[in-house]
């Protein structure tokens, strides 16, 4: 596995692979890799000649009161996990390398951001889209891999690739879960033992919603109420949102039909957790 911190080296390497006719699978991350990331790496390994992984905690996507300084980092561990999972190139630039001077141009996301997490994190997805635009230009991959745990991010990346004509195939990989259903996340380490016991209620609530829809329920408000009620009954968490939209364009629906997302976010004392499911409804 080649490890590099320099943009120039990364570009040269990737260019060489492309000249050799090799396909490149790219997994952009903020590090502190867990099974969710490993699922992305495995999928990339199956589908490409070369797997490139980036680890970069992007300051642009953290709000003023968010956990940039506290976000877990362990680059040696990340390197080990990457190597064990067949990564060919490990790219871990510094903030100075990625942002050597203040940006004169930045990407602003116009659609798909005024709902879900985007609502309470203004500017967050502009930061995501800006760093991905940079990374896509540096790596120029054949395919880019993202987890459906952050389904709004997947929707934003879908729009970014489409609108900027990146010749990149977006591969969305299903959420990886603990045995009790809790979505794997770098932030789960913040949960107290009591909160960890309650946290699977998010996925259980979503499963209740799925069952109701399978039994014919088509009213989004009824579905949201059902999910909220389940979470309030089974946890001490404060609900940030429970929302239902069309997917991936994230538009409100009067009646459930087509591809939809049911998404939740809650705040425990020590961590904010998100989860979602997508369903195809006829």
UniProtKB/Swiss-Prot annotation:
The keyword ATP-binding is assigned to this record: yes
Q: What is its EC number?
A: 6.3.2.1
Query: What is the gene name?
Result: panC
**So what does this one do?**
Catalyzes the condensation of pantoate with beta-alanine in an ATP-dependent reaction via a pantoyl-adenylate intermediate.
**Species name for this entry?**
Geobacillus sp. (strain WCH70)
The principal location of this protein is cytoplasm
UniProt subunit comment: Homodimer.
Q: So what family is this one in?
A: Belongs to the pantothenate synthetase family.
- Residue sites binding beta-alanine per the record: 61
Report the pathway entry: Cofactor biosynthesis; (R)-pantothenate biosynthesis; (R)-pantothenate from (R)-pantoate and beta-alanine: step 1/1
Residues reported to bind (R)-pantoate: 61, 153
Extra notes?
The reaction proceeds by a bi uni uni bi ping pong mechanism.
Q: Which GO terms describe its biological process?
A: pantothenate biosynthetic process
Q: Name one Pfam family in it.
A: Pantoate_ligase
Name of the protein in question:
Pantothenate synthetase
* Catalytic activity from the UniProt record: (R)-pantoate + beta-alanine + ATP = (R)-pantothenate + AMP + diphosphate + H(+)
